[in-house]
Amino acid sequence: MHVLHAVTSGWKQLGRNIRLFFLANMLYQIGTGMFSVLYNLYIQALGYEDTMNGTIVSVQSLATALVFIPIGLIADRASHKLLLSLGAMLTGLSFMGRAFASGESGLVLLAVAAGLFAAFFQVIAVPFLAENTDKQQRLKIFSYHFSLVLAAQVLGSSGGGVLADLLQQAGMEKIHSLQTVLFIGGAASLLAFIPLLFVQKTAKEKVLVETVVPEAATKPMVPAKDDWKAICKFTLAQLIVGTGSGLVVPYLNLYFTNRFAVSLSAVGILISLGQVMTIVSMLIGPTLANRVGPVKAVVLFQMMSLPFLLLTGFTNLFVIASITFLFRQALMNAANPIQSSIMVDRVSDARRGIANSMTQTAFMLGWATMGPVQSFLLTAYGTYWGYAITFSMTGVLYISASAMYYFMFKERKTAASKAAAAM
């Protein structure tokens, strides 16, 4: 009862717009979770080679990357409520169309459409949360946000995998069962626009009056040059991380089914468990950040994930692969809300939309470029060495990104500390 009361009390303390956004995002991410686990299995069930999955991931990621910056520029000037609502509706409709597409051209075109529309939520979520919270709450709210995203994806991925297996056991063909579940996922994402209709339009003006104006009266404006310097640093780090992720993350379900021949339910449950562990690590992330500093916390989480990443790539034992996958998933992703908080704190309000869009663009470009590389390595070296090589390449890229992140942002933090001490 005490835990339930604490959760209820914490929920009520959130602003109205934050609660509505969290509800909408939960529906949206349930649909995304279903697609993340089942869609490349659907492509495989249609009889396409693994290279087709690589193509789909690449074109979708590239489409998303291409519109990140335009949406970021629009988001700094337009209604976040309108853009989020459009994103939910169009993403849901594109998902529903993808559930029944089977021809190569249809698969590619709808992948492009889904990639374009998915950018709305990815770009606008962080600026929306930032404008509806004060600085002291941001790290906590970002942790809640990323944890809620993963919790909803747990429901989507685990529920989708189990439902697909149940439909097959009831006599439905594999392709039809996957189509049914994918359509349900699209409908869930579509319904996300309903809570967004009740978001108050005056939220942005309210925050500007209460927080930005007093700060402007007491602090000099951040020079645009400093903003763009910070944005470029964040973008470079995310490009390297995205390149590494693009070799492994989109194909984790295929990794388990190809190497260990496990069922759809097992894959869905395993990926869901990884997300549950990530939720826990994200919630304890702010505590670590308060103790060692946010930059060091990001680097520690990322570096601790590397041994588990390599063990996953090289093991032939399903039990070991499952355990190492869970720890890698939790540790690597635990840094995400901390990184968002660092970026929001180091970039002024006027450029947060473009900052988030540029870092997201860099990350998705990494995914887009690595799809064909992963497919080639898997085709050329088989399901053991192909995955071993891609996991190893990802490890090298993660080490590079972590080292770069530490030295770039450690210098800025040290300079700020010296300035504060001098005062």
Regions found by a protein language model. Name each.
Residues 67-79, 164, 281-293, 378-379:
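Helix-to-loop junctions at the C-terminal end of transmembrane segments
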Residues 165-187, 376-398:
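A membrane-interface helix-boundary motif in multi-pass transporters
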Residues 1-15, 201-237, 422-423:
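Juxtamembrane intracellular "pre-TM" segments in multi-pass secondary transporters
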Residues 110-149:
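Cytoplasmic helix-loop-helix junction between adjacent transmembrane helices
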Residues 82-97, 296-311:
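Structural signature of the two symmetry-related core transmembrane helices
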Residues 188-203, 306, 392-423:
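Multi-pass alpha-helical transporter architecture, strongest
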Residues 26, 94, 105-121, 239, ...:
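Hydrophobic core of transmembrane alpha-helices in multi-pass small-molecule transporters
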